[in-house]
């Protein structure tokens, strides 16, 4: 049987407040520790756009105002096996952005322990993995053009 990659959406989540773009990053606690954007699996038969809306709501407690799909995707292998992901060796991601209202975030405490609203320069330093840093650059370039 061929090794499988779990299909997910990466969601660079932002809000525009006082003419500045603020990015929402979450502090991961499940499976690994570090900072990331909301992300999550695409549940069959849901669409990628529906997965974006669901994951943003689940992980932040906020509804999306705008969603944009980007022509960027990739995959990565897990560094170790996870009991809840035993059928997969890694994840294949599709990049989206989602605008939400700036303000209070209601975290899913099983996955994340904290959050921050940051400007691009601060967010790019905090994000843990290179593929999410690249995703942030792509979205920021689009939003600031």
Task: Briefly describe each language-model feature range.
Residues 20-63:
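Conserved Nudix-box catalytic region and its N-terminal flanking loop in Nudix hydrolases
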Residues 1-23:
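Conserved N-terminal beta-strand and adjoining loop/helix that marks the start
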Residues 61-104:
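Active-site segment of metal-dependent pyrophosphate-handling enzymes
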Residues 13-15, 27, 95-99:
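Short, well-ordered beta-strand micro-motif
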Residues 29-35, 104-145:
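Nudix hydrolase/Nudix homology domain
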Residues 18-19, 102-106:
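Short helix-loop capping/hinge motifs at secondary-structure junctions, enriched
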